[in-house]
Amino acid sequence: MFKRSGSLSLALMSSFCSSSLATPLSSAEFDHVARKCAPSVATSTLAAIAKVESRFDPLAIHDNTTGETLHWQDHTQATQVVRHRLDARHSLDVGLMQINSRNFSMLGLTPDGALKACPSLSAAANMLKSRYAGGETIDEKQIALRRAISAYNTGNFIRGFANGYVRKVETAAQSLVPALIEPPQDDHKALKSEDTWDVWGSYQRRSQEDGVGGSIAPQPPDQDNGKSADDNQVLFDLY
């Protein structure tokens, strides 16, 4: 009797789910929140994952138990649905970064927090960092990043390649338009900044002279160079 009542309640609550999707975060909004709440991971990497996971919708919920994907416009209603389904022992992927409910306790998340952009991004960054092994070269770091992304999706360093998830994130990263930043007033400083490299940051350069795209391994920076806002990033941008 209890199970039937619970199933009916779930069906009724699902019926109140808005047919129109919640407004996703804009690229500027996402960039702002990611830099504030998850500064240790490259914003573009988090954006690529968010695009694949939720299409930047902080109120997206995927019920792995029933196979439903729900989108809400009201945070309170979405929180109630998450709590109700967790009480029914469902496995849920919740919020902007689609954090699985099994990880809530480990990450210090609540249903309310998981549906907010800042806690979701912070949790995602912690999960990626915990799975990122690093490396000696840029290529090794890129491989380690992709393995961390695989583990983010599957809990395994290999299965995310086999199921196509890593490739989806790579494709999403390539399709995202970089954020427009304020150009430095001093052209000389701008040129110097382009040559700056930090092992914890990200570095990409495309040859304009030859018209050929590709990453070029940079030289280490001078010790006098100032640090940018990205110098504390642990994970590289995908390239």
From Swiss-Prot:
Pfam family membership, one: SLT
Keyword Zinc (UniProt): no
Record keywords, A-Z: Crown gall tumor, Plasmid, Signal
InterPro entries: Lysozyme-like_dom_sf, Transglycosylase_SLT_dom_1
UniProt keyword Transmembrane helix, yes or no: no
Signal peptide coordinates: 1-28
Region (Disordered): 202-232
Database matches in CDD domains: LT_VirB1-like (cd16892)
Similarity comment text for this entry: Belongs to the virb1 family.
Record function comment: VirB proteins are suggested to act at the bacterial surface and there play an important role in directing T-DNA transfer to plant cells.
Protein name per its UniProtKB record: Protein virB1
Species: Rhizobium radiobacter
Gene field: virB1
